[in-house]
Amino acid sequence: MGKYIEQYKQMYYCGDMLFYWLGDICKLIDLTEAKSLLDFGCGQGKQYCGWGDLDAHSTLGMMPALYDPGVEQFEKMPKGKFDGVYSTDVMEHIPEEELPESLELIFSKADKFVYLAICTSPSMATLPNGENAHCTLEDIDWWKEIVNRYRPTDILTHIRTYNQHDQSENFEVIA
């Protein structure tokens, strides 16, 4: 894993996309009675530090473990498994050939649920090398197919895709 990691280390992603999907994640926490969480691709983690009136861990009811290979402070994967693993605005940044490894890692850390929010349109951000920050742009059916290849059948999985340009969304539950 890591074709673009050095590129992302030069950028400053704060983690604010999580706020769009907190409602979905909170429903999964309640449904599964989750007691531990992992934010896979947390960015700089500012969403957990009280950002004005916004404070994600208060909304979630707990502080998640944080992982982001592009941020030095969070580049080490937390040990153990978690009831829930969520990843928002991350998968589209991973090259297609590296997705199997990433999905296997995500599912290996989850005991009850996985939530993926994935953008399906080009990013407004450009990497330092000039490439668009979203390198894997596919529709929800494609994502559902690849996720199903790596998803254990006992892990409740929700996929939300969205297009940031036309504000369209799709939602799939894989039970």
Predicted segment positions?
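A short beta-strand submotif of the Rossmann-like class I SAM-dependent methyltransferase core
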Residues: 84-90
